[in-house]
Each structure stands twice: as C-alpha cells, then as structure tokens.
Regions:
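Scaffold/interface architecture of coatomer-like assemblies
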Residues: 33-326
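Positively charged n-region of N-terminal signal peptides that target proteins for export
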Residues: 13-18
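Bacterial N-terminal signal peptides
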Residues: 20-31
Length: 326
C-alpha cells in the first residue's frame, strides 16, 4: 500500500438499523455486560441510578453541532418521552482503547504500517497530561501493548511493538477492549479499532459485541485500513463500483453504528490523518444525557431527538431496565 498526501477521507454516512427482534435475543448478554460495568461507569447520580447516554449531533451537511443545550434535546424511551435529569456538554478528558489488528491478513499490502500511521495520528490528537490512551493488539487473543497513560511519547514508542501474526478474533477483541475502557474514570471513553475487517476466529458475533458495548455506553470507532480501490471515498476506487463498504467491512460497520460509533476509511496518509482527527473531534463534542430508567424490565430502545429536525443524532440503541441493567 502506497501512502501519498492529498486524498480525502471516505466517510460513510447514514445509519443502519438492527431489527428490534435482535435486541430481544441479546437481553441476557446486555444484562450481564451492564451488571459488570454498573459500578465502573462515570454516571450521574440523582437519588436513583440514571441511564447515561452519550450522543453526537450533526447538521444536514454532516458538520458537528457543538452548541446545543439541555432544552434542545428530548429522549424517547419505548415511545414515551423521558425527563432529562442531567446534561453535560463541556469539554472533558478522553480515554481511548486503541486496538490493533495484528492478524496475518494485516501483513499484506503494508496494512500494518498503515494502521500504525493512523494510530500515531490518533495519539497526536490527544492533549498531553489530560487525555489518556491504552494500546492493545489482537490476533487470536487480546494483548496489552501499553497500559492506559497520559504520556503520549511513551504511547508512540510502544507502536514499534505491534507486529502482525496469526488468526483474527476481531469481535472478541473489541468486546474485551470495551470492558477495559469502561473501567476508566473518564466520562468520554471509546474503543478505536484499526483493522482490515477480516475475522476468522471469534466466538462472538458482531451483533453480540455491539450489544455489549452499547450496554456499557462505550462507542466503537472502526478505522478500516484498505487499499484505495476499496475505499468508497477515494478517487482511485474501482470504476463503476457502488459507494458501499467492502464485504469484510459491512458487518463491523453495523457494530460501530449500534454502539453510537462510526466507520472511517484509511487508504492514504491523508485519509489516516482525517480519520484520526474526526474520531477525536467527535468524542470531544459528545453530549452526555442522563434520565431515569423505565419501570418495565427488559430491553428499552431509545431515540434522542433535537428541536432542529434536520439535525442527525447518533447514540447507542438502548438499555436494559431492571436490577442488572442501566
């Protein structure tokens, strides 16, 4: 893979929806995941435990909307409007679990080097001494390359320890990384995955992983390391090809969307930089919204709306109410 400056980021727009029936089948997994993280999440407290969701808002041109207030939002829970008990929009420290795919497929077309390039840009976007990141690698298992740290120089130095080898347990690794970052004290937390999207060895499906990450309100961002011909946003994409993701990327795009995250492409040095910047910028401008959970136990699909009808809000798909859920 040859990297040259001047190419634009291919950003995938539009929200894919997972059928409500899927959420019902995943209730045990959701409840277990939320029970694990219940005491770890940076949540609001107001007499009772509140459901906390993070949301990003974009206007009709895809630009982040950064100046909304509590009165501009409404929460719809199972078709009913909920009162917003707490609201935050101020800038806050970030905590990122940066997850490298080091499977054998990443050793072709220089994808591993491209992933390190994108990670370097991610770390450059962090504020020294304020934001933190941890580096993790996976093939058939998850491995900690560097613990969570605010020392960006140390994090960059650890990138040299990432080398491709083995099978791919992508979905399992995302699940494990989400649990790691959910334990961090920062309110703005996310998993950023650098991968070609090929999974050969996971036990968990993308739907199961997205349900687990959504349950603990950890958005998953995918930076797909692909060739320019496979990048829907590249002017070197295959002529006549539809502007859709390659087959190996489609399922993890759903995974990212369901958690409130997003999919970006990295096929050139410029698009790697743009993807890293877009992820961090979005996380810095999350709105944190808290409300009392519904009384009925089980899965609660939620929708966050704004008073501006042309604004698009992205957030997790719902939560589980009951003793184990939040």
């Amino acid at each position: 893979m040859t990297y040259s400056f001047g190419k634009e980021l291919g950003y995938v727009r539009g929200m894919r929806r997972i059928l409500p029936a899927l959420a019902i089948t995943l209730l045990p997994l959701l409840a277990a995941a939320q029970g694990t993280a219940e005491n770890q999440q940076a949540t609001f407290r107001s007499g009772v435990d509140l459901v906390t969701v993070s949301a990003t808002v974009r206007d009709g041109k895809g630009r982040l909307v950064k100046d909304l207030e509590k009165k501009d939002f409404e929460v719809i829970d199972r078709g009913e409007r909920r009162i917003i008990n707490e609201f935050r929009s101020e800038r806050a420290p970030l905590s990122l679990a940066i997850l490298f795919d080091v499977s054998g497929s990443m050793d072709t077309a220089d994808r591993a080097t491209a992933a390190k390039f994108a990670a370097h840009h991610l770390i450059n976007q962090l504020e020294e001494g304020r934001d933190e990141a941890g580096l993790f690698a996976f093939d058939s298992r998850l491995r900690e390359v560097a613990p969570f740290s605010v020392d960006t120089r140390a994090l960059k130095g650890a990138l040299g320890e990432v080398d491709p080898f083995g099978a791919t347990s992508l979905h399992d690794a995302i699940s494990a990384a989400a649990e790691r970052v959910a334990a961090r004290p920062m309110a703005r937390r996310a998993v950023v995955v650098l991968t070609d999207g090929i999974d050969t060895a996971s036990r968990l499906t993308p739907a199961q992983v997205s349900a687990k990450a959504a349950a603990i309100d950890v958005p998953v961002y995918i930076i797909a390391v692909v060739l320019p011909i496979d990048d829907p946003g590249s002017d070197r994409a295959t002529p006549g090809a539809t502007r859709t993701a390659p087959a190996s990327i489609g399922t993890i795009e759903d995974l990212a969307r369901w958690t409130g995250g997003a999919l970006y492409y990295s096929s050139t040095s410029a698009s790697a930089y743009q993807a890293a910047r877009a992820v961090v910028d979005e996380l810095r401008h999350l709105y944190l919204i808290a409300f009392e959970p519904g009384a009925a136990p089980g899965w609660h699909p939620i929708e966050i709306r704004t008073s501006q009808k042309d604004f698009v809000v992205r957030t997790r798909g719902g939560y589980v109410a009951g003793p184990a859920g939040r």
